[in-house]
Regions:
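C-terminal lobe/tail of nucleotide-utilizing enzymes
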Residues: 1-27, 209, 213-232, 242-412
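Nucleotide-state-sensitive switch-loop elements of NTP-binding domains
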Residues: 2-33, 41, 46, 50-242, ...
Length: 412
């Protein structure tokens, strides 16, 4: 992946000297928070919770989802979302808005913005090739998400923009989209196709003409003609797109932008989170927070060095110990419970010990996975969110998650 960091320095991890949780500091101090992670880990809900916290802390906040499952509207208690920000009413000092990315509408607006004349814009928007690619071309959604992010940040009154990204491996395209667009606009073939004054036949060599004739036989001459007309109508606009992509790239790397990784205790999602953290590190981007959802509570654990860890809540930077009221459950603790269950086999209390042993075995494995992940993103702060009684589908459910994510850090 190409690094977007050349434009500016990476912000350091925040501290919690005043009793705020480190993640609450991100909400207070950053302009953009990007929630990343694999599918099925509660990332969409987490993005909504972060945005809600922004409103509760007095910020004018908008949350953007490009999640095709459209779960964000459910989490916010809305019937649906559109490409226009919708206000979510609530009794909080700030404002909360939400929208669903509409790739084609965003692309249309960008064309209209950079067209030299209204006529040029109309020709492109009416072009059959453009209508086909504007919502379906690979990478278009990712770039338009970045364009919407830039628009909301630079051309609106929002203090905080929270972005819910696609599942992990697609999110890498999301990060690299501005640079890929720039490379495309600089490609020699593109530059030849946008030069109507020289004519296509004069601009391309014999091999290219042969290729176009072959393509015409497969997809139809009208499709190729539309494509050529589109590129020629695009002439003069590429510099505006290129400059916009560069500014988006700078924004991703700016200190005001924070990347928060979302995961769950399952091995596959932890591996995905490791993968994404590694790719971010390669790009020179620091993970500013880790939120782990659906953490199993622990019973009968042993206290870790330096004290116990809560079953849910925010840990300061460097404290990566998932655990329960008595700290993390080690494999030795789980084995000890299993031996006691065998000793008491056939009794009611023995059955209870067997259930506890099975539970501890699960939590022991999960905690081993999570400890490695927390170490991989250190010194980023970590928040553990326990299993909840029901899925989050309204503001009340989001409040319950927020109590764990943004739990205040005790001060000395």
């Amino acid at each position: 992946m190409t690094s977007p960091t050349a434009a500016g320095p990476t912000a350091p991890a925040v501290s919690a000297a005043d009793g705020r949780s480190p993640l609450a500091e991100l909400v207070d101090e950053r302009s953009i928070i990007v929630c990343c992670g694999s599918g099925g880990v509660g990332k969409t809900t987490t993005a909504a919770v972060v945005a809600l916290e922004g409103a509760r802390r007095g910020r004018n906040t908008v949350v953007v989802t490009i999640d095709p499952a459209k779960r964000l509207a459910d989490a916010l208690g809305l019937q649906g979302l559109t490409d226009t920000p919708s206000r979510i009413e609530g009794d909080w000092p700030g404002q909360l808005w939400a929208l669903m990315l509409d790739t084609k509408s965003t692309f249309d607006a960008l064309v209209a913005k950079h067209a030299a004349t209204p006529e040029q814009g109309r020709r492109i928007l009416a072009n059959g090739f453009y209508r086909n690619i504007s919502g379906a071309l690979s990478g278009t959604q990712e770039y338009m998400a970045m364009e919407k992010l830039y628009e909301l940040h630079d051309e609106s009154d929002f203090d905080l923009v929270v972005v819910d990204t696609p599942p992990t491996r697609h999110a890498l395209d999301f990060l690299d989209a501005p640079r890929r667009l720039s490379r495309f606009l600089e490609h020699r073939l593109f530059r030849m196709l946008v030069a109507p004054s020289r004519g296509l036949v004069k601009a391309v060599n014999v091999a290219a003409q042969t290729f176009l004739r072959t393509v015409s036989k497969v997809v139809g001459g009208d499709v190729v003609d539309d494509a050529i007309a589109f590129f020629q109508a695009f002439e003069g606009m590429e510099e505006g797109f290129r400059q916009r992509a560069a500014r988006v790239n700078e924004l991703l790397a700016a200190p005001e932008t924070a990347f928060v990784l979302v995961a769950s205790p399952r091995r596959d999602t932890v591996e995905e989170a490791h993968y994404f953290a590694d790719r971010l590190h390669e790009a020179g981007i620091t993970v500013q927070g880790l939120i782990v959802n659906r953490v199993h509570p622990t019973f009968g654990g042993s206290s870790p060095p330096g004290g116990s860890s809560p079953p849910g809540g925010s840990h300061p930077a460097g404290d990566s110990s998932p655990g329960g009221p008595s700290g993390p459950v080690t494999a030795a603790v789980a084995a000890g419970t299993a031996r006691r269950a065998e000793t008491l086999a056939g009794t009611d209390i023995g059955g209870l010990y067997r259930n506890l042993a099975d539970f501890q075995a699960v939590t022991s494995r999960e905690q081993a996975h999570l400890a490695g992940l927390a170490e991989a993103v250190a010194p980023a702060p970590v928040a553990w969110v326990p299993f909840l009684r029901s899925d989050v589908h309204d503001i009340a459910g989001m409040d319950e998650v927020a109590r764990h994510v943004f739990a205040p850090t005790p001060t000395d």
